[in-house]
A protein has these predicted regions:
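Non-heme di-metal
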Residues: 1-145
Length: 145
């Protein structure tokens, strides 16, 4: 039974027509979690489809399979019995790695074409997404350990 107070407060703020950015200011959560969410919605609000696709591709579809493989590899020798979690992780690795990742990369390629400025923006967004994801996971680690 996780404490959902801040999540419920955030959702309530959104439902009360606060912007995501203002709703984030109202909740008491880790600054790293706020930064990750804020950054994500800044990209969305930019309206630049190639940047949104880059965030999705390089901040999620391309890196999550590797992260989940590491978790699976650490669960097995530790003899941790989490069959549902393991199934969830393995399924994500299979779908994201074999299907979603390649399709997402193709989508970015299609959206950028030969436009050097778009490719530069995609590179910057991808790099920043990975850094924000690392900060998020470090914050989660600090909270639960």
């Amino acid at each position: 039974n996780a404490n959902r107070t801040q999540i419920d407060s955030f959702i309530e703020s959104i439902n009360s027509n606060y912007s995501v950015f203002d709703a984030l200011k109202r909740v008491k959560i880790s600054n790293d979690v706020k930064e990750f969410t804020h950054f994500t919605f800044e990209i969305i609000e930019s309206g630049k489809i190639h940047c949104i696709a880059a965030a999705f591709t390089y901040g999620r579809e391309d890196i999550i399979p590797e992260m989940f493989i590491e978790i699976i590899n650490e669960l097995e020798p530790a003899n941790v019995h989490c069959n549902r979690l393991k199934y969830y992780l393995e399924r994500h690795v299979e779908i994201d790695g074999d299907l979603h990742g390649p399709i997402a990369r193709e989508m970015v390629k299609e959206l950028c074409g030969t436009d050097k400025k778009k490719w530069e923006e995609v590179l910057n967004v991808g790099r920043e997404c990975i850094l924000k994801r690392i900060q998020l996971w470090d914050a989660i680690h600090d909270i639960i350990v």
